[in-house]
Amino acid sequence: MKMWFRLATFVTLIIEFAHCQLGAGLTSALTGNTGNAAHAGNSGNMATSMAMAAAMGSDFAALGPLGAKLFSGAGMSPAVAYKMFDGSVADFQKYKAKMNLMKRLNAGGSGGIAGGGGGGATGGLGALAMGKLALFTGGGMDPVVAYKMFDGSVSDFQKYKMKKKLAAAAGAGGGMGIGTLAMMDGSMADMAKFNMLSKVLSPPTGSQTGAAANGTSAGAAVRGGSSPLRRIANMRMTRKLCEDTPVVYRMRRCSPQLPCRHALTTCKQTLRYGSVCCAKNLYAAAMFENMPGF
């Protein structure tokens, strides 16, 4: 009985929170009356989210179309945005932290929206609203994924600054994939992880570059491009593809004719179910994936 009473109380609190904080705009979105599903047109999303922005208070409304686009203009419905809040007492603090973060990112005006570049941080949020993060050069990112990176904690702005530094380290044409961004959790260990991974995935030598044409192990190191960040992302993505798939698929994908293409090397060690990646690479990947926060 106590459990049901607590559950009913919790649900009531969530409903009251939604009603008070987000207003009628969100309530109608949650009940489906606005037609604002995840795949609804941007114009419908925009209208509803602007109403939601006004209901959420002057902080959010002051951001205008940019603030609304962060939630729905590029594919995020108000209902989905609301689900990011769990109904806890900390929700209002999360809301304030996110508003402050958006204000900092938007400090340079509208230049970032138009060009995806702007000045400094502006390009990051401007491009976010348009469907990509200019902050992370070349590594197109879904707005929902980008928004979820920030959890409303005090460390959000530190995460932003660290990721900006890492993106700069990758170089203008380096690119940063979603796989790489997922590695970064905002902890103090992030820079150490980056430095260590960069050493392991050091730029290929002349001999390695030449070997690429022959499809040798050394030559495969250059498949991911010259950027350490891109190679890190490729390492994780390829490992996932080749090692975490069902055996039937793995046999086709990683046969002796189509060896498992790891970002570090190409292996031709044939086992019972086909080809697998070299032990050296498996060790390297496991070493980093087992690090705290990785």
Curated annotation (Swiss-Prot):
GO terms for cellular component: extracellular region. Its main location: secreted. The keyword Transmembrane does not apply. It is found in: Secreted. Nacreous layer of shell (at protein level). Expressed primarily in the mantle with highest level in the mantle pallium and lower level in the mantle edge. Residues 205-225 are annotated as: Disordered. Keywords: Secreted, Signal. Residues 205-221 have a biased composition (Low complexity). Residues 1-20 form the signal peptide. The keyword Signal applies. This is Glycine-rich protein 2. It comes from Pinctada maxima.
